[in-house]
A protein has these predicted regions:
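Hydrophobic core
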Residues: 11, 15-18
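Positively charged n-region of N-terminal signal peptides that target proteins for export
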Residues: 1-5
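Extracytoplasmic/lumenal domain signature
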Residues: 22-62, 66-103, 107-144, 148-370
């Protein structure tokens, strides 16, 4: 049986100006997942420009797309494709040493594409020549976390899903030049994998969290833990992001608790929290927040409906929610576009984890309460 997996280009070419080099273009600075490109404003401006399909045996998924100078890079199964911006045709391709898991959060730094793959491995491909330069050792498990790059080092985590639904895993650091292991971290007393979560650098420490709900402050280049903090007993399957005005990190637990985390001198100094949906009987959230103009946007499912929640990033209190469809969780990290405007109005884009699939948008402005 062959499964055909499709990649559709939905937005106009203007969104390519964003040129994201990794998931959310997260680089540990203010404004992650916020763009100024003149993106489409309404349904009439949207639609598929082209679609491509990859024919594979059995089940396969597409990685996140990476925008390069010469094309779009995407992995399906164990093949890396370079696609034309104009029509989606395959320009070049190369076979990887492992297949990707259900998620593959690649990262492009200069002309080096770092690709997390099955069995807890990372492979580096030079996209100028489309040749593999190195493959890391195997850490085991699935590569489901985001990938973070900082000053010549790569950071990512692994996940092993056990029969009872719990997870184990480790976090690791690689030398980006040759793929050699610099350090690994595993909390065997409080096991938990790194399932869609990831790391961020603040000042001179690496911060990451995962399914055990524990935030870790770790040395960038040595096997040294500076500090830990138990944020929650729930899983954390969202990434961390930074907000300049509060000088704080933010993440969300699976139970819908939003955390604001202040750090200094490699220590976790203060943790504040708030609920993204008050009054709901059941909430699940794996969406990484996006922050703009002190408003925080995060997706979830609450009482069987998908939502995007708009929160006050200063007080951690809900402002309002945008309701989606039944049984259609908003797992995506909302993309906020200013469209080059200085009025404060933004367009917020998101997708829902349900068929038939698609892209949705709404407008928001400072002071908007509904």
């Amino acid at each position: 049986m062959k499964k055909k997996t499709f990649l559709c280009l939905i937005l106009t070419a203007a969104i390519f100006l964003s040129a994201f080099s990794t998931f959310r273009n997260e680089q540990g600075m203010d404004g992650a997942n916020v763009v100024s490109s003149v993106t489409p404003e309404d349904t009439a401006d949207c639609g598929a420009i082209w679609a491509n399909k990859f024919s594979t045996k059995g089940f396969s998924c597409n990685s996140i797309p990476i925008m390069g100078a010469n094309g779009i890079y995407i992995v399906n199964s164990n093949t890396l494709y370079e696609l034309s911006y104009a029509n989606g045709q395959v320009l070049r391709k190369t076979t990887l040493k492992e297949k990707m898991d259900s998620v593959c959060n690649m990262l492009l730094e200069e002309h080096f594409l770092y690709i997390p793959l099955a069995n807890g491995t990372m492979e580096c491909v030079d996209i100028n020549s489309m040749t593999s330069l190195w493959q890391s050792e195997s850490f085991g498990g699935q590569s489901l976390s985001t990938t973070f790059y900082h000053n010549g080092y790569l950071y990512a985590g692994t996940t092993n899903v056990l029969s009872n639904g719990t997870t184990t895993g480790l976090f690791y650091c690689l030398n980006a030049k040759d793929g050699s292991t610099v350090w690994t971290y595993e909390d065997k007393d409080h096991p938990g994998g790194y399932y869609w979560s990831g790391a961020i650098v603040y000042e001179d420490a690496l911060y990451f969290t995962g399914d055990n709900g524990i935030l870790v402050s770790h040395s960038l280049t040595e096997s040294v833990v500076y500090d830990t903090a138990v944020l929650t007993t729930a899983n954390i399957r969202a990434g961390l992001t930074y907000h300049k005005e509060t000088d704080a990190l933010y993440t969300v637990a699976k139970d819908g608790t939003l955390f604001q985390i202040q750090c200094g001198n490699q220590k976790i100094t203060k943790v504040s929290s708030g609920k993204i949906m008050n009054g709901a009987n059941f909430v699940t959230c794996t969406s990484t927040p996006t922050i703009y103009n002190n408003r925080l946007y995060v997706g979830c499912m609450a009482d069987q409906y998908g939502y995007v929640c708009i929160m006050d990033a200063l007080t951690l209190k809900p402002i309002y929610q945008v309701k989606g469809f039944q049984n259609a969780e908003v797992k995506s990290s909302p993309l906020v576009s200013t469209r080059g405007s200085s009025t404060g109005e933004v367009t917020v884009y998101f997708s829902m984890n349900a068929l038939p699939g698609g892209l949705y948008a709404f407008k928001d402005t400072e002071g908007n309460l509904l």
